[in-house]
Amino acid sequence: MTNQSLHVNIDKWIAENETSFLPPVCNKLMFFYQLNIMYVGGPNVRKDYHIEEGEELFYQVRGDMVLKVIENGKHKDVHIREGEMFLLPARIPHSPQRQANTVGLVIERRRLSKETDGLRYFVANSTEVLFERWFYCENLGTQLVPIIKEFMDSKENETGKPDPANPIKPAPYPLNTMNVMTPFSFREWVEKQKPVLASGCPVDMFGEQFETETLLFGSGTSANKRRTDGWIWQLEGLSNVFMNGKEYSLTAGDCLLIFGETEYKWQRSQDCVALYVAQDPDRKRPY
C-alpha cells in the first residue's frame, strides 16, 4: 500500500522533522491515512477556531500549550501541560495556542465524505461569529492557509464587525454541549493502571462514549483485524507485531501504524506497556 515505513522511533522522527513545523499551523504529519498522526510545534498563536465532526487526542511531548475552546457558549482556556493528555470531543470550536520550543502530539481521523469542517472567527471578547467558512477537509495544514488569508484581507477583519452583505449562514450541524475534560498526567495514569495490566486485561482510557479508542496493554498475545487504522505506541518493554509476512520489533519509544483490514498478531513481553489508539466513525455520537 505504501513505501513509507510504518515502524518509527518517535524521538528520532521529531528530531529529523522539527524544522518542518512551520506557521501558521506548524504541524508535520507522521502518518496520513485513515488515522492522521501529527506532531505540532510553535510558536503558533491563532485567532481562528476549528470545528470538526470527529475527535482530537492531544498529548504534550515538550512544553505547555493552551487550547482555547467554546464550551456551552463561553470562552474557556484548557491548559495542557508537558506530559498531559486530553481528548477533545467532536463539534467543539477550538483554537490551539503554542509557544516556541514546544512539541505536541495530535491524533485525528480522515473525514467521511459527508462530514464538514469549519473555520470560525469571533467578534472580539464575544462569541458572536465574525467570519466563517465550511469545507470538506482533506489536508488541514494546506487548506487553512487560504482561508486565513481570505479573512485577513476581509472587511470583517478590517472593521471587527460582521459584514451585512455576507450574512453568516446556519451551521451544518449543532455544536456539542458537553463540558470538556480536565487534562491529566499520562504517565501517572499509566502507573495507576499497572495492577490491572498485571491481570492480563487491557485498560480503556476514555470508555465507549467516545469514538476514540485508547487502550493500554500489558503482557500477552492478541490477534486482530480492525476496520480502521490502529496506532501502537510502545511505552515500556518490548513487543512484536506480525502482519503481511513481516515482523516488527518495538522497543520503548517506538510506534507502529497498522492499516485497517489488516490481520495482525501482537506478542507483548512480560514488562510491556503499550498504548493502542484507533478512531472509528461508526462510534460517533448522534447530534
Curated annotation (Swiss-Prot):
Involved pathway(s): Cofactor biosynthesis; NAD(+) biosynthesis; quinolinate from L-kynurenine: step 3/3
Annotated binding of Fe cation, by residue: 50, 56, 94
Location of region: Domain B: 181-287
Positions annotated to bind substrate: 56, 98, 108
Cofactor section: Fe(2+)
Reactions that this protein is recorded to catalyse: 3-hydroxyanthranilate + O2 = (2Z,4Z)-2-amino-3-carboxymuconate 6-semialdehyde
Disulfide-linked positions: none
Documented EC number(s): 1.13.11.6
Subcellular location: Cytoplasm, Cytosol
GO BP annotations, alphabetical order: 'de novo' NAD biosynthetic process from L-tryptophan; anthranilate metabolic process; L-tryptophan catabolic process; NAD biosynthetic process; quinolinate biosynthetic process; quinolinate metabolic process
Main location: cytoplasm
Domain of life: Eukaryota
Region (Domain A (catalytic)): 1-163
Classification via SUPFAM superfamilies: RmlC-like cupins
GO CC term (a single one): cytoplasm
Keywords: Cytoplasm, Dioxygenase, Iron, Metal-binding, Oxidoreductase, Pyridine nucleotide biosynthesis
PANTHER family: 3-HYDROXYANTHRANILATE 3,4-DIOXYGENASE
Protein name: 3-hydroxyanthranilate 3,4-dioxygenase
